[in-house]
Structure formats: C-alpha cells, structure tokens
Amino acid sequence: MSQDLQKEVASRKTFAIISHPDAGKTTITEQLLLFGGVIRSAGTVKGKKSGKFATSDWMEIEKQRGISVTSSVMQFDYNGSRINILDTPGHSDFSEDTYRTLMAVDSAVMVIDAAKGIEAQTLKLFKVCRMRGIPIFTFINKMDRQGKMPLELLAELEEVLEIESYPMNWPIGMGKELAGLYDRYHRVIEQYRSEEDERFLPLGEDGDLKEAHEIQKSLYYDQALEEIMLLDEAGNDFSRERILAGEQTPVFFGSALTNFGVETFLRTFVDFAPAPSSHESNEGIIEADNPKFSGFIFKIQANMNPAHRDRIAFIRICSGEFERGMNVTLTRTGKSIKLANSTQFMADDRETVNRAVAGDIIGLYDTGNYQIGDTITNGSKKLEFEKLPQFTPELFMRVYAKNVMKQKHFHKGVEQLVQEGAIQLFKTWRTEEYIIGAVGQLQFEVFEHRMRGEYNSEIRMEPIGKKIARWVKEEDADEKLSTARSMLVKDRFDQPLFLFENEFAINWFNDKNPDIELTSLL
C-alpha cells in the first residue's frame, strides 16, 4: 500500500453513537453534521410538531415516532479527518441491528442523560463495545437541565460499567445555573451562551483564570475548582493507551440541544479516536493496510428510495481500496461481481462514490446477491470475516396477506424485509405458512407499517405468543414430536427448529428425547 493511501486510511474515523432512547443521540448527531458543514441547521426530534425532522431519522415511521429504528450512515470531513458516523437504533427491540452496526465501527460515542445516568439499553450496548475492545467516548448530555451531580455520574459510570473514567472537562453549575465548562485538556474555560470571540477563557499555571472575569462570580465556580482539584489528586491519570484499549473512557459534559461543548468534544474526539483497525477472519488478522480490497456486509436496507424500490447493502471496507467498477468475489457463493453501482450517504441523500478506502462505509445496490455477514474481496476467494450476531426471537406472529390478489406484493415485502435482518422468518413445517419472529413488539409494528407503505400490502398478524426457539439437526426433525407446546417449524434457510411454549416444555422434551440436541442463537 502506498504512503498516500496509508495516510488516507489513517484519516478515517468510523464510529457509532449509542444511547438509551431520549438521551439526545440524534440531536448530538445533528450538531456534529452541522460542524461538518453538511447541514445548515439542526432539526431536532422535537420537530415532530414543527414538521422538521432529524437528518438521520429518514424513514417515515421514525419521523412520526421520533425514535431511530434503523441505523443511518453519515459522512463528512472535519479538521483533516474523514468522519463516518453510524447512528444506531436506540430502541431495545432493534438491538440486533445495533449489534451488527457495532461490528462495523472502530470506536463508539456513548451519550448519557445527566438526569438519568446509566440506563438499561446503554448498559447493553456498552457491553458489546467492551466485548469488541473498542474505545468508548462518553458525552454526558443535557447539562442545561437539572440532573445528577457530576461526581455522582462519574461514580455511577465507573461502578455500573466497570471502566475507568477521565473527565476531559467539568461543568461549572448546571440547569439554569450552568455558567461554563472547565476544559482540563485544552486548559481553557468555555463559557455558556457567550459570543464566539469571548467563549474561551485561558487558564493559568495554577489552574485558575489568567485574568479576572465575571464567571468567577458564579456560585458554582469555586465548587468546580475544588472538584477539579479532587479529580487531579484522587482521580484516574489520563492514559491514551488505556483509552485506545477500551479500558478508560474520556468523559465530556455538554448540551447537544443548545450546542454547548459539542464542537470541543468533536475536536478532541478526532485527536484521540483510532484509525481503522484490523479484523479477524478465517485466514487470520486482516490489517487495514493490506493492499487487497476486502469488506463485509453488516446491513441491508430496502426502499431507501421508495420511488425506485431499491435495496442497498452497506459494506464496511476492512482493507485496501475500493474503485467503482472493480470485480470482487462474493466468498459465500464464489460468484464474481462487478461493483458498478456504489453510493455514499447522508441519511436518505446519496451520491455515487468512485473510490473509498479501509474504514469507509459504502452502499452497494443489491439485486438479491447479498446477505448480512457476507464477505467480498479481490483477494483470497475463501476469505470470511467473523460472523455477525443473530438473536433468537422471543415473540412470534403468523402473518397473512389480507388481499389474496396481492400475494406477489406480500411475498416480495416479507422476503426483502427479512433479508434486512429487522425481523426473522419461519414457516410451518408442512403448509409453509409464514411465521415472523421478533425480539420486541415494536419490530412487528414497523414491519406492518412498512409492508403497507412500501409494498402496498395490507397484512393480518395473529399472535402465537412468546416462544422459545431451539434448532435441531435435520435428522432429528420428526413431525411426530410436534405438539401445541413444541411446534416444529423451519427457518428461512429450511433449517428445522421447535418453538417451545416455556422452559417446562423444553425440559419435558429433553427428558423424552435425550439424544436430540437443542441449540439457540445469541
């Protein structure tokens, strides 16, 4: 790989934003896009009433509900770096999509609501990042409102997440009393709601302001200095190595809604976030500077442009250089594919991309070639990157087309939405009626909404309740074992499994059939 190309790869910063719903993830994404010069004004999720919608919430149902249910991809340049942001679903029902997205990034930004601290979904997603060993940057949001005390938030962060923290800045007051941020890294105080030329006040060697200023009259100024002294004496030492190893999280305070502390965060993040990392494969570690092009598909999205009924496969480039028109091998099938139609994104806006390098996320127009988890490369034809996580669904519904004359629309819709991985498809053993499985109820609502809106197919869903899915070997798929409490079905790859009513039904089945091995997904 040439030095120029190595430099280009090193400039990539590819990260996901994770949080619990309503922590302000979409708002901070909007502000980052603002600083990247991509949008002129940030439309927050509050725009549900005003008709202004967030850039990353492009799907109709997301606009209506104000939650992210698909992972958007956005790209911009900032301070010599190419930023690739993946905005992940905050809702727990879509955790599988989020988990797959986290396999495609080199670091994560965790957004925490200052009033609520660590919430359930944040903890779940944090654990995945920890499992991958990627750096995690923390942004404690909504400091313009009353919330938990900063020291309390730090203690909770370290205790619940079991990670070291290092506050890069420290709030001077909060809520109505918020006066500024003491920036430990840049050695300045950033004033809240001040003119641009007066916003940053330099600090002296003693840690206080070089010159007297009004902010020192704030009730919370002395308290902030005392807390910073405490952090200097008793807190963790700053360690770039531990940050890159995912063992220490730099913590930033701010307010995404009032755009306070966000650009300072972005500037610092770009300094510290890692360049594209290596990826594990069946042929060993594939480094980003490997000259052979390779990548994996972590997401498929149908109908990003409803007028064209298209399908886009999102690929994380792991090594080498992509050039439009190049020939690659889809290693799952051994098929040679010409990558003639490729695109980069700003939510639903897109432009053709002629070249991209390791770390970039690009979209490939898909006519049905790809599956989630596929590897493509112009190198070894047997290369496969590590498998992406798939969750065992817990809720199941039979699904039918209301209008039998529109079976074609119905089957196409089910097939495409299942290929996206947002919902899982099963069929009854003999009659092959459709059963769909999901992790949570919202997935069914989104499925129904999209079938109606994107495929013109009204559907009827009949709950068959909460079930426990367990796969069996083909030779063990005996229809005589199928009962109301242990229904034999097949998945979309025609692999047999039983849907059990409860743990008792599984235990009963195991007692009666000790030689049959039951397996689950994640």
From Swiss-Prot:
InterPro entries: EF-G-like_DII, EFG_III/V, G_TR_CS, P-loop_NTPase, PrfC, RF3_C, RF3_dom_3_sf, RF3_GTP-bd. GO terms for molecular function: GTP binding; GTPase activity; translation release factor activity, codon nonspecific; translation release factor activity, codon specific. Keywords: Cytoplasm, GTP-binding, Nucleotide-binding, Protein biosynthesis. Its main location: cytoplasm. GTP binds at residues 19-26, 87-91, 141-144. CDD domains: RF3, RF3_II, RF3_III. Gene3D superfamilies: P-loop containing nucleotide triphosphate hydrolases, Peptide chain release factor 3, domain III, Translation factors. Pfam families: EF-G_D2, GTP_EFTU, RF3_C. GO terms for cellular component: cytosol. One of its GO terms (biological process) is regulation of translational termination. It is found in: Cytoplasm. NCBIfam families: prfC, PRK00741.1, small_GTP. Belongs to the TRAFAC class translation factor GTPase superfamily. Classic translation factor GTPase family. PrfC subfamily. Increases the formation of ribosomal termination complexes and stimulates activities of RF-1 and RF-2. It binds guanine nucleotides and has strong preference for UGA stop codons. It may interact directly with the ribosome. The stimulation of RF-1 and RF-2 is significantly reduced by GTP and GDP, but not by GMP. HAMAP family: Rel_fac_3. PANTHER family: PEPTIDE CHAIN RELEASE FACTOR RF3. This is Peptide chain release factor 3. The gene is prfC.
